[in-house]
């Protein structure tokens, strides 16, 4: 059997950088056609010393999930466009990474420095429904969205206020938070308003207003709940003592050339931005 005939009996895969193979199936396939090819492919990959198999089934190929599981595959994750299954066929412990373990949230401390007021909202639904608590605008960062972009978007969506990113003031990590499974990382961002007229989001926001920061900090909820008291205190300290510095963003690129943001001490971020393009020096 020549190579062309052999390839016709196998699922076509692309090697990854870790001794594995990625298979991306997009065209309809019957179970009768799929199972023999999968079995032959597993034998072939094993003989080649392959370790892990990533089997990506496009939406509409759900008929292949159960047969793949019967051959040792397990579900890794699913999106609207596909289902990803994996199989580890090497005789060493699996090193395949788990499904995404974290969710990224943002909260926006939008401060009007002239009036010393902070932008706050009351939500229609959620944890604070019916409590009367005024809270900072919050939300979840979307896939492919930067932390600072998510904060700006959430504020504009919820209140109509346009802002500029200033700093990440702090962040919080909480395990088994989202769906009682995923870890939630929450970034508290300071934003500078560039508009001030509130136009609340009717679908999610019950009310929105500018509140004196002391009034926000001294709400019974913020005083009773330690985490909220700590974050409110950070916001107050930022207003009272501008020496409190968080992390500013520095646009850079990864080794593959993709844009990426580095967050670091504001003073050093300003230095890095000011010296961009210059030869690096020690110290």
UniProtKB/Swiss-Prot annotation:
CDD domains: NUDIX_ASFGF2_Nudt6
Molecular function terms, GO-annotated: ADP-ribose diphosphatase activity; metal ion binding; NAD binding; NAD+ diphosphatase activity; NADH pyrophosphatase activity
Annotated Nudix hydrolase domain residues: 101-233
EC class name: hydrolase
Function as written in the Swiss-Prot or TrEMBL entry: Probably mediates the hydrolysis of some nucleoside diphosphate derivatives. In vitro, it can use both NADH and ADP-ribose as substrates; however the relevance of such substrates in vivo is unclear.
Motif (Nudix box): 139-160
EC number from the UniProt entry: 3.6.1.-, 3.6.1.13, 3.6.1.22
Annotated residues for binding of a divalent metal cation: 154, 158, 204
This protein's name: Nudix hydrolase 6
SUPFAM superfamilies documented for this protein: Nudix
Gene Ontology biological-process annotations: positive regulation of salicylic acid mediated signaling pathway; response to other organism
Source organism superkingdom: Eukaryota
């Amino acid at each position: 059997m020549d190579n062309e005939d052999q390839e016709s009996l196998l699922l076509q895969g692309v090697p990854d950088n870790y001794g594995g193979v990625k298979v991306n199936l997009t065209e309809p396939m019957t179970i009768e056609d799929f199972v023999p090819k999968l079995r032959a492919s597993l034998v072939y990959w094993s003989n080649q010393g392959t370790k892990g198999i990533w089997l990506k089934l496009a939406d509409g190929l759900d008929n292949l999930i159960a047969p793949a599981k019967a051959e040792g595959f397990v579900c890794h994750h699913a999106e609207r466009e596909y289902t990803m299954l994996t199989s580890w066929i090497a005789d060493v412990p699996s090193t395949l990474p788990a499904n995404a373990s974290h969710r990224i949230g943002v909260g926006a401390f939008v401060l009007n420095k002239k009036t010393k007021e902070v932008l706050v909202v009351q939500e229609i639904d959620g944890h604070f429904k019916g409590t009367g608590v005024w809270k900072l605008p919050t939300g979840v960062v979307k896939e492919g969205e930067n932390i600072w972009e998510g904060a700006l978007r959430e504020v504009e969506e919820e209140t109509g206020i346009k802002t500029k990113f200033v700093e990440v003031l702090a962040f919080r990590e909480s395990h088994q938070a989202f769906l009682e499974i995923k870890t939630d990382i929450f970034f508290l961002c300071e934003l500078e308003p560039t508009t001030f007229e509130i136009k609340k989001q009717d679908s999610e926001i019950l009310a929105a207003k500018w509140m004196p920061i002391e009034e926000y900090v001294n709400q019974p909820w913020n005083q009773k709940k330690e985490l909220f008291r700590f974050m409110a205190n950070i916001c107050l300290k930022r207003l009272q003592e501008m020496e409190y510095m968080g992390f500013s963003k520095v646009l850079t690129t990864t080794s593959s050339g993709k844009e990426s943001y580095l967050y670091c001490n504001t003073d050093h971020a300003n230095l890095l931005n000011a010296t961009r393009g210059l030869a690096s020096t020690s110290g």
